[in-house]
Swiss-Prot record:
GO biological process: inner mitochondrial membrane organization
Lineage: Eukaryota, Fungi, Dikarya, Ascomycota, Saccharomycotina
Protein name: Altered inheritance of mitochondria protein 24, mitochondrial
Top-level taxonomic group: Eukaryota
Keywords assigned: Mitochondrion, Transit peptide
InterPro entries tied to this protein: AIM24 (IPR002838), AIM24_sf (IPR036983)
């Protein structure tokens, strides 16, 4: 026993705890040292009062639902259409120096891979200025009450990012930053299959017919991503693995457009059949009821409640059958297995988490409530009689005196 404990303690020393953080900015190594942090949009923080070579992205609030952008002159800022809250400058002269235009980014590929075309507003000025960008855009197709938050990425050219949610790209800037669309791989690569010792074709778990593509971010620049709920960062080292819900996976670091199939594989939890034991298999003796013990129900409400009860059971049966059929055809859980080294961005709420079914409580019937209130309480007495061939027979009566008189007349 002591030897087993010693071996277990030695094994635990090689396990690295997985750290999940929630930073507002995901900074990659070797970042430029001239990027400073800002707390809010104030007069002393405006870029025209200090030396600013690159734009600054800073998420504000808890949760971070607003993105503050400080931009130097002649640097274009791209934000999603209808998400701009305000534009601020040190004096009134900045209004005449700002120019804006609407641009479509890969409209054909976005329509084919994602089923929609998103518009971005390009803002550029000859003087420094500041922007406030909202995490939600006023689009009729994307109108929702879900809480969203920002996470900013700093790309220095050493790593690329695959954004799996096509509506996550809210703002970006960078002279060499490239935003392109690629098809999500359906199966894993041969390299990953040989590493995992898989012989047959295995799916990545990311491919869906209603969402065929992802956005690839390459080059140098800054990006503001939007996720449902809060956004968390997971850093996986070499040969580390983690199971992630596909709907909650917002973005992942990759090395080129064809690296996504080298790190993700579909995972299905093993389904165990329920044990069929002998517990509860003993047959109970049926209860015999006398005709006098059964009270006939002639009330309409009684039969109506029976019909509603059976209808409720039928509806629940069809819902359960639909859920079991979906789990059988699609899978019991929608998880993917991610293999490091990778950086992951997770959103706490999935896209379809708001459409949860809730069972409604039955509304009380006022007529039944009034009838129960107006109904007078009455006492029922139980008595027993000895009948030949039947033995002791228990009965109930509201009037004990009348029952005694009936028994005396019957015996006489």
């Amino acid at each position: 026993m002591k030897a087993n404990i010693a071996m277990a303690s030695k094994q635990l020393q090689f396990i690295r705890s997985l750290i999940i953080s929630q930073p507002p900015t995901i900074a990659l190594p070797n970042q430029s040292s001239n990027i400073s942090k800002i707390e809010n949009i104030k007069g002393n923080d405006l870029p025209n009062q200090k030396t600013l070579n690159d734009p600054e992205f800073q998420s504000l609030g808890q949760p971070a639902s607003v993105l503050a952008i400080n931009s130097p002159p002649s640097v274009p800022i791209y934000i999603r259409k209808n998400s701009l809250l305000s534009i601020y400058g040190i004096d009134n002269s900045f209004v005449n120096s700002i120019k804006g235009s609407v641009e479509f980014i890969n409209p054909l590929k976005r329509f084919i891979y994602g089923g929609y075309v998103s518009k971005y507003q390009k803002i550029i000025s000859t003087v420094p200025f500041s922007l406030l960008v909202s995490s939600s855009s006023k689009n009729f197709r994307l109108r929702t009450n879900r809480q969203k938050s920002f996470a900013t990425l700093l790309l220095d050219g050493t790593n690329d990012w695959a954004v799996l949610n096509n509506t996550a790209l809210q703002a970006y800037t960078g002279g060499t930053l490239n935003v392109s669309m690629f098809r999500i791989p359906k199966n894993i690569s041969k390299t990953l299959a040989s590493l995992l010792k898989i012989t047959n074709a295995t799916e990545t778990g990311l491919f869906r017919w209603n969402n065929l593509g992802y956005a690839l971010l390459t080059g140098r620049g800054q990006v503001g991503l939007v996720g449902n709920g809060a956004i968390y960062n997971i850093n996986l080292k070499e040969n580390e693995e983690v199971l992630i819900s596909r709907k909650n996976l917002l973005s992942i670091s990759v090395n080129g457009p064809y690296d996504l199939q080298n790190c993700i594989v579909k995972y299905s939890f093993p389904v165990t059949k329920p044990e069929t034991g002998t517990i509860g298999s003993t047959k109970e003796a049926p209860v015999q009821l006398n005709k006098d013990d059964v009270i006939p129900a002639n009330n309409f409400n009684h039969y109506w409640n029976i019909i509603k009860g059976y209808s409720r059971h039928i509806i629940n049966f069809f819902k359960r059958s639909q859920r079991l059929t979906y789990n059988f055809l699609v899978g019991n859980e929608d998880f993917v297995r991610v293999i490091g080294p990778r950086n992951l961005l997770l959103q706490s709420n999935s896209v379809g988490s708001h459409s949860t079914s809730s069972s409604e409580l039955p509304k009380p019937n006022l007529s039944n409530i009034k009838a129960n209130i107006e109904k007078k309480s009455s006492d029922f007495l139980n008595y027993v009689t000895i009948e030949p061939g039947r033995g002791a027979v228990f009965k109930s009566t509201p009037n004990f005196r009348e029952s005694v008189q009936k028994i005396e007349k019957k015996s006489s």
